[in-house]
């Protein structure tokens, strides 16, 4: 063995004066009054090593080394209270190089300030940075915690296939050509949707897995290109509320244990309908740490003669203690409004005596002024901002203005995890061509069941679909599944699919549902997104050991890469120019 102790575990009073063997990487080399100091780093921490100059000849930073020496207390002036081992040091009798390090492309301790492309190319160096390695170790701890939690809740872990059939719904698939069956393809699963539903039909009451999911879609700060992981679970004989309670139990316990003592929404989490979320927050992913609320003033300006507002949807946001802000603040908000597509951002300011001023004040009809004050809940020293457009745009713009105001005014505190469920999504919507399509998951049960599908306007039908949102980030989506074959066929027919098409596209699911399928429901909290929140990471790639870059490239291994003509022939593929 190269070592019997790690840097932190050897920092003990009982070991003082004993000869120890350590191994790790050279984090730094310093000269202090003619004495050489080497900081030895392993995955537990750092230990200071005192060495002679001749022992450090030809040793470079980040080389891996083997150290033999005696543990002793540091001199008082050399104590470092910032690290666990700060009272101890090793007096080296021998230092040998195990692996020499070439010229470094960047300093490991400063790697988080290096361009991402370089960090990913030398990810093996980037991960030596204790901040980065700590995140990956935390990922392992959380995986362990979640598995134990699911076992404690009575769930059975089942791995579903990675090579499966392509699905016509959802995002773009990653396709894998078959060598054996010319012209046919496997697909990497976007989610274990069909398999987990079939497990419920198979008699499993509670299923879960930490499921890898593959989607060929563009990246965002909170969405990794290529692959991601989710805590996928499903329950048989379950209502929506049964799933909500399990989701609350999992997330509350997880964030209580790993959430750095931040405040957490206690169960039951607020239930907010999609309609209410769009009306009050302008988003179906509301950040409830932001206490600003959107209200509707369309009736106030109806028939007012003010062309910019009359006949349109008018939204407003009352911001307390904002009227004394300098003119530059209001100009900046107006510039932001224009940058997102608005004509401009009107406002009224109220002083301490509730005297109004601002460009919109004169357009409020006198006989509706009190109603305006009541609806907006205007108060001394507040400002009221106005957003006007056609309804979908007005809601969207109001949501963006609400977020911008909170960020500019420092209204969002980072000491809280605010959870909520978003419920009652529309089952259908119209696309740009006016065609009725599914809004979200096509396998969801419509509220009202088959009767609603037969007798209601499709655009009025709500689905048993739900999201979990935390601090403005969608952590999970889920649904009560449509387990009735007749209802499933009708749901797809409304979206333009014939019965034959449904059966041909989803033969295994349709066939399984014909054999006594139980009512079932589930959800799948995004594992990477949960880790982002728990580590205060702004980019999902920070919580993945070997992520693709934002262009879906693995710059470490060079994927996607060219393959030989022979490999292409074996899988019956020809590349077109």
Language-model region placement:
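Class II aminoacyl-tRNA synthetase catalytic cores and aaRS-like
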Residues: 1-577
